[in-house]
Amino acid sequence: MPTISGLRRRGYTPESIKNFSDEIGVTKRDAIVDVAKLENSLREDLNKKAPRVMGVLEPIKVIITNYPDNEIEYLDAKNNPEDESAGKRKLAFSKQIFIDKNDFMEDPPKKFFRLSPGKEVRLKFAYYIVCENVIKNDSGEITEIHCNYDPNTKGGMSEDGRKVRGTLHWVSAQEFIEAEVRLYDRLFISDNPETVSYTHLTLPTRIFV
C-alpha cells in the first residue's frame, strides 16, 4: 500500500521520501504524480550509499572451456563506485559461472549487445568472453553456454585497447547465495484508478470451499 509504513517495508528510505516531497511541492489542487518519480528519488538516494552486489534472476550456467580446472581466483570489485570510502569486496571467479538467461540470445536482433554465438562481451570486474557453443536438453532449452575467455582482459579491460559494448552481471557457480526476490510492478491497470468504473465487479453470495 502507498502508506509511509508500506513504503518503509518496500525499502524506501526517509531521505528518498523527503526528496520526493520537496520535488513535487505542495498544491491546493488534486494532482496525479507518476510513481516513477518516487522510484527515481529512491534510486538517486540509494545510488550514493547502497553497497553493490551482482545477482541473476534466471540463472543459466556458463562454462569457460579454456579456464583452468579446479582453480578459483578472487577479483576486486568496488562496493560503491559513487563512494570510494565504501571500499572493495572479493568476487570468486572460476571455470563455471551463472549469467542471467535474458543476457543471452542464440539468434539476436540488431543492437543486441549482450552474449550471443561468436560475440564478445565483458563480465563485470572479470574478463572478456566469447560464446563458442550451446548445450540444449531434449526440449530444446539451453542448459549450458560454452565460452572462451581472454586472460589478458582481467578487470574488464583489454591490453590491445579493443572495446566491447556489452557488460554482464554474473555469479560464481561455486560461491553463490540463493535469494528470494519479490518483483513489484504496477498494482493498477490505469494511471488514474479513480476514473475507472468497477461496476462490472460483483461480490459472490454463495461460495463452496
Question: Whereabouts are the PLM-identified features?
Answer:
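Flexible, glycine/threonine-enriched loop-and-boundary segments that flank and lead into catalytic domains
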Residues: 98-122, 126-128
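A general structural signal for short secondary-structure junctions and capping/turn motifs
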Residues: 8-11, 50-56, 63-66, 83, ...
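Extended, domain-scale alpha-helical bundle/helix-rich regions
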Residues: 2-86
